[in-house]
Structures are given as C-alpha cells and as structure tokens.
Amino acid sequence: MVPAATGPGFSKKVFVSRQKAAYRRVLNEDDVFALFQPLGFKRYNLEDLKFVEQVRLFQNAEVVVSFNSAGLTNLIFRKPGTHVIEIFQEHEENYFCYLSQTLHLKYDCLKTTPLKKNSGYTNTTVPLELIKDLIKRKFHN
C-alpha cells in the first residue's frame, strides 16, 4: 500500500513534461509551460520519479496539465475533483477523457496538429493562443 501524500514537496498544480520522450515531443513545450508557470504550476518529468513518487504527485494534485502520454494512467491515484487538462494531437484517441469521466474528474482538452500527417510518432507544436484562451477561461473567470 502506498502512503498518502503528506507534507511539503509536490505542487498541487502539476505540468507533466514530455521533454525526455523519444517521440511525440512538443517542440514548444518551454513556451507552453511558461504560460502555466505564473499560475503556480511546477513541471515534472515522470520518468525521473519513482513509482511511489508518481502516486504521491497525482494524489496531491488539484490540477494536472499533460500532453497525451501513458503517464496519465496515474490519474487513478488522483483525489476527487482533480481538474485534468490534456493536450493531444488530432489523430490520437483521447482515452484519458473516458478515464476522467469514469473517475468523475473535471476534464478539458486541446487538440493540436501533428507536424507530419498519418504518423503516431511525430512531434508537434501547440498554438500558444489556444493555451492563452484556455487559461483565460479556466483560471481567470
């Protein structure tokens, strides 16, 4: 059994990075994160965390911003009411939308266009105006 997340350490506002990913990288991830950072988000590379740390990270989170990745399976460890913002390429399935619905989480998504069509391994860039609009709607209401 994993102990509950307690004490200082992980931010309640989590930005999951794909900087170390071998494929489906977000070429302007630094620019995207720069828009979330002033809101108190901290960036995490899940591959740098032990399993128990990933569990604690998601247990503690109130908001999770993530590009589509297997790391979002950690949503099963979330606390009720967690807000999930998933960014994924238009050809990808948004399975984590279904998981979020099943877990009764707040869910929003942004679709991006891959740099190459018909490839599940291509990199992408995220239009910053979409991020700014989402932040305005969700965090500055």
For the regions a protein language model found, what residue spans apply to each?
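Active-site donor-binding acidic/aromatic loop of nucleotide-activated sugar
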Residues: 43-47
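Hydrophobic alpha-helical positions that pack around
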Residues: 1-35, 124-141
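Cofactor-binding loop segments of dinucleotide-utilizing enzymes, especially the Rossmann-like FAD-
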Residues: 18, 87-89, 112
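Leloir-type glycosyltransferase catalytic cores
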Residues: 99-141
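A donor-sugar binding/catalytic signature common to diverse glycosyltransferases
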Residues: 60-104
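Short acidic active-site motifs
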Residues: 53
